[in-house]
Amino acid sequence: SHKMAHIVTLNTPSREDWITQLANVVTSPDELLRLLNVDADEKLLAGREARRLFPLRVPRAFIARMEKGNPNDPLLRQVLTAEEEFIVAPGYSTDPLEEQHSVVPGLLHKYRNRALLLVKGGCAVNCRYCFRRHFPYAENQGTRRNWQTAMDYIAAHPQLDEIIFSGGDPLMAKDHELDWLITQLEAIPHVKRLRIHSRLPIVIPARITETLASRFQRSSLQVILVNHVNHANEIDGEFRAAMAMLRQAGVTLLNQSVLLRGVNDNAQTLADLSNALFDAGVMPYYLHVLDRVQGAAHFMVSDDEAREIMRELLTLISGYMVPKLAREIGGEPSKTPLDLGLKQR
C-alpha cells in the first residue's frame, strides 16, 4: 500500500528532515561546481562575483538531480551565478511588479477578492531569475506581530475569500507557525480558500511532513498548493511521494513555471514537463514569460518566440495539460494572458 512505501522511504538518507537540509544548503559556486564535476572555465569563474548581487543558495537534494559534468544542465542554470547578471539591461527594473503597495506590513491586497501574505522572506533555493531578488523583505518581515495585523485586515475586508501565502517561500515557516496562521484564517468566515505558492516541495520534498499534510486535511479551508517546477528533471520519486500525500489530504495541486532561455525554451521540454507533472498529480497552470528584473535578462525569451513555442506545444499534448502563457505587469492587479495569435481555422 501507499502508506508502507512511504514509511520505507523515511529511512533513506535523503529523507533527512527539511530543517537539517536547509541548514546544509550549498552557498559557494565553487563547491556547487565541484559536486557536479564541472570544470570552472573563465566564464563560470567570472560568474562567481554575482553572488554579491544575490547570494547563491541550493539544497543538496536538488543538486542530486543535476547531471554530473554538464555545465549546461537545466537545473544548474536556474541556480548558478552568472556574469550576465551584471549587465544593466535597459527596461529591466529592480521592482518589476511595483509591489510597494502593501496595505499593512507583509500583506499585499492587489486583487479584489484575494490578498497575498508574505509569510517568510527567505527561500530554500535562490533562483537567479527571481522577480523578488530586490524585494525589501526587512520591512515586510514575517513576524507574529505583522501576521496578527494582517489577520485583522483580512477579517475587516469581507470581499477577501482567498488568501495567498507567498514570500520568499511560505513553507520556510515551520509547521507550528503554519498551523497558527491556518487556525486564524479558519476563524474568519468569509475566507474560503488558502493558496500556497512554494518552491520547497520540489527542491526539498521532505518539507511535506505528515504533520503538515494532516493539518491541511483537517482544515475547513480549501487548500491549493502551487508548485514551481521548470523542468521535468526536477521531478523525482520523493516529490511524487510528497504530492501523493497531499492529494490524499485533499489538496489541489497546481504548477507554475517560468519560460527560461537555456532551461525550458522549447516545446518538447515543456511537453515532457507537463507529462511529468500530470503523472505526479499536479496540473500545469501558468507558464510565465520572465519579469523584466535586473540581472535576469540573459534568461529572456521574446514574446514572439514564446507564442511560437506554445503553438507547437498545443500539437504535442492534450489541451488540459497546456499551461496558460502569462505575464505579470507592474501595477496591473492580475496576470495578463498573452494572446497566442491562434487564427480561427
PLM segments and residue spans:
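Short cysteine/histidine-rich metal-coordination sites, predominantly Zn2+-binding motifs
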Residues: Q141-T149
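Conserved AdoMet/S-adenosylmethionine-binding subsite of the radical SAM
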Residues: Q148-E162, L171-I317
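N-terminal pre-triad scaffold of radical SAM enzymes
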Residues: P55-V58, H101-R132
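Flexible, acidic/Gly-rich N-terminal and inter-domain linker regions that tether
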Residues: S1-H109
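Iron-sulfur (Fe-S) cluster-binding segments and ferredoxin-like electron-carrier domains
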Residues: C130-G142
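Conserved, mostly hydrophobic/aromatic
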Residues: F62, C127, Y285
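C-terminal accessory regions of radical SAM enzymes
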Residues: R307-R345
